[in-house]
Regions:
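Extracellular/surface-exposed low-complexity segments
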Residues: 336-447
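Intrinsic low-complexity/disordered segments
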Residues: 21, 185, 226, 443-444
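Right-handed parallel beta-helix
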Residues: 6-7, 13, 18-30, 74-75, ...
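Extracellular beta-strand scaffolds
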Residues: 1-3, 8, 12-14, 33-42, ...
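Charge-rich, low-hydrophobicity low-complexity segments
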Residues: 43, 50, 61, 84, ...
């Protein structure tokens, strides 16, 4: 029990301050529970460690219900190697823990100016952990849990968190931040993972992101499934954000200069989600892309075997769509290039259009529709262009004799049920109420 404020300092040899014995002084505190009614300062050692005694867990500080406002603190001051451990057991931090360099906390050249290591089977952080340099938390066979409103902060260095599973409710902040879980990782809506100057990397087998992740560049990777909840926000201040998973579901917001979404299986953007590549490229790469949310970029790329959905993908300058299987926009999917080119490749064949709107079509249907439409001489250029636009979205062979039906869906006529039917030698325009006007077409283009 620490009942008074205590400072444990390395001894000093007054006659020879360079003594190897003194300069390499180490301190080990072994205990099951370190109760603090006052602060504890450990100063000047080469190595200082607080470790679990015997075959026990280690608890530092006492549980508090006052939001830890009056919690006591353990300080490692000018200690080269600061460590808290419980080999094969659990560490619970109820007190504040920090490392400092009281002579010059900004002097990173000082040997006694390194960070803090916390190692155990399970690590539970119920209060703030602060280092003027680096923090390394390791629970490779267990769980790392951080409490809401707590902060793990490396002021001038990096934070590394490694665990089998992770449940993050507080803030993790450093110049760079790496959070790795070999199994599952959950970041709660209250959580914040912040890389102030560099990369924020979050890696797991399965990941559920409910909070905020930010950095100059951000990478979120799941070897299996990745889910971002509606409460989540993933932002990159001026760089790249990449999400990679076997299967992904995006319900929150993503905002970066460039955004890349990679899935080898299914990628779903949930209605209400918002993905922005503010000044660069939005790239969506998936086997099956189900796009129900809103996505935008200066340039957009959608590469998938199959694509469907009811959402909107908007490019300011250019859009590229490469679908090797089926493109299904019948539920309302819009892929739009506002001011530039929209290049569509369906099953390896390229068609240039301005936008893709609701409908279903195969590449063969599109090419045949455009070929036949060129024969219709009594249509104006505007009408022909309108039909050509419909070609990638609502043109279908409906009979085996190469009859093509275009469901114009308010694009060509004021009646939603209107149709244009083109078969060999004839094009018919129907208002949907039974009336139809037909014109003959020949291969030579003459009526």
């Amino acid at each position: 029990n620490i009942t008074k404020q205590i400072t444990i300092k390395k001894g000093v040899n007054g006659e020879n301050s360079d003594s190897d014995t003194e300069s390499q002084a180490n301190l080990t505190i072994k205990t099951k529970e370190l109760k603090l009614t006052e602060d504890l300062s450990i100063s000047g050692f080469n190595k200082a460690e607080i470790t679990a005694k015997g075959n026990n867990d280690l608890i530092i500080g006492e549980t508090s219900d006052d939001s830890n406002a009056n919690a006591k603190k353990v300080t490692f001051d000018k200690v080269k190697d600061s460590k808290i451990s419980a080999n094969g057991h659990n560490v619970t931090l109820n007190s504040k823990v920090e490392t400092s360099n009281s002579d010059s906390s900004a002097d990173d050249s000082n040997d006694n100016n390194t960070g803090l290591t916390i190692s155990a089977k399970d690590v539970t952080v119920n209060n703030d952990v602060t280092s003027h340099k680096t923090i390394n938390i390791s629970a490779t066979t267990g769980n790392v849990t951080t409490k809401e409103s707590t902060t793990i902060n490396a002021a001038t260095g990096s934070v590394e968190v490694t665990a089998k599973t992770g449940d993050i409710s507080g803030t993790i902040s450093g110049n760079t931040v790496n959070v790795t879980a070999t199994n599952s990782l959950i970041t709660q809506s209250s959580s914040k993972i912040e890389a102030k100057k560099g990369e924020a990397n979050v890696t797991s087998a399965t990941g559920t992101i409910g909070g905020t992740i930010s950095g100059n560049t951000v990478s979120v990777t799941a070897t299996d499934s990745l889910t971002t909840q509606a409460s989540s926000s993933i932002t990159s201040s001026n760089g790249q954000t990449t999400l990679t998973a076997k299967n992904g579901s995006i319900a929150g917001s993503i905002d970066a200069a460039n955004v890349t979404l990679n899935t080898t299986g299914t990628l779903t953007t949930v209605a209400g989600s918002n993905i922005k590549a503010t000044s660069g490229t939005l790239a969506i790469n998936a086997k099956d892309a189900k796009l129900d949310g809103t996505a935008s970029g200066d340039r957009t790329e959608v590469n998938a075997t199959n694509a469907s959905g009811s959402g909107r993908v908007t490019a300011k300058t250019s859009s590229s769509v490469n679908i090797t299987g089926d493109l299904n926009t019948i539920n309302g999917l819009n892929i739009i290039s506002e001011n530039g080119r929209n290049t569509v490749r369906l099953r390896g064949k390229e068609i240039e259009v301005k936008y893709i709107q609701p409908g279903v079509a195969s590449v063969e249907e599109v090419i045949e529709a455009k070929r036949v439409l060129e024969k219709v001489k009594d249509l104006s250029d505007e009408e022909r262009e309108t039909l050509a636009k419909l070609g990638v979205s609502a043109v279908r062979f409906v009979e085996p004799n190469n009859t093509i039906t275009v469901n114009t869906q308010n694009e060509f006529t004021t009646r939603p049920s209107s149709q244009v039917t083109i078969s060999e030698g004839k094009a018919c325009f129907s208002s949907g109420n039974g009336a139809a006007v037909c014109t003959n077409i020949t291969d030579g283009g003459q009526q």
